[in-house]
């Protein structure tokens, strides 16, 4: 039996979505991350950093906190993606630094949801 070639269902011919710069620089410590999220609640990177920091504590309470922070970052990111032309599919490249807040929040959400 000859091998079949199947179409890649994940392949998307859409152009990659490139988010604009985040309103906050990446916070370096928990206090900076809290201050950044308070100043700019739409900051993708602030929520991602808060989630990542909470994941490192590895307690039940910090896991719930991480999930909430990651979920907030994820939804703030979806809002930004849609404002920039994303329609629910298509590449969001890691190489474009402003996309990293979304991708990091998505990663943190997946980790927190499994704890």
What residue spans do the PLM features occupy?
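Short, solvent-exposed interaction modules
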Residues: 102
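N-terminal alpha-helical interaction modules that lie
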Residues: 1-91, 97, 106, 111-115
